[in-house]
Amino acid sequence: SSLCRMNGFDLGDKAHTAEADTSGMNRLMKLISKKNPELFKKCISLNDKKNVLSSIKDVDYFCHPETFFGRTRQFTSSYLCEHPVYKGYHLVFDLKHDPEAMFSEKSNEVLKKVLNGAPKKYRTIKANKNPFIQDKSFATNYGDEYTTLGHEILEQRANFIIENRKELANRVSLIISDQFE
């Protein structure tokens, strides 16, 4: 209701009822489609989970938000593989970490500890949850560690993943599968 109020259509005392929330969401979507049609098309393009894989696998790297502990953070990642247990869940490598240094570790036991240690080295994108995938050009817009790294290093890290994807995916899948046995 606060988003509606901020955009000039207060829902009044009916806020948080099914009818008012639906009406408010409808008006917000119309406003977004009018003011920023490209953003609107991008948002609804990933409603179909079949479109998600190509939007993350067919590019070298991309940006996506993730919310945890009530805080939304922006991540820049490169596609690794589908989750070995949960179909439609896609594992992506967080490019703030150096994949070449990490995967140079030959022992899967040591790699498992590194991958699962804090901070997380990979993230999960759920195709059926309408993820918001942004172009890589957004990577350096937030004044964070990705800005410090810059596009050149992000590109190098993404290329390492792409060139070695099959081997990296096999190792990560094996490590994750072992956790489910």
Model-derived segments and spans:
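Non-catalytic terminal regions of proteins
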Residues: 101-103, 111-181
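Acidic, Mg2+-coordinating catalytic module of metal-dependent nucleases/exonucleases
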Residues: 1-50
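Acidic catalytic cores of enzymes that act on phosphate-bearing nucleotides/polynucleotides
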Residues: 43-125
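Generic serine detector
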Residues: 1-2, 23, 33, 45, ...
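Acidic-enriched, low-complexity/disordered segments with a strong bias for Aspartate over Glutamate
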Residues: 10-13, 21, 48, 58-60, ...
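Residue-identity detector for threonine
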Residues: 17, 22, 67, 72, ...
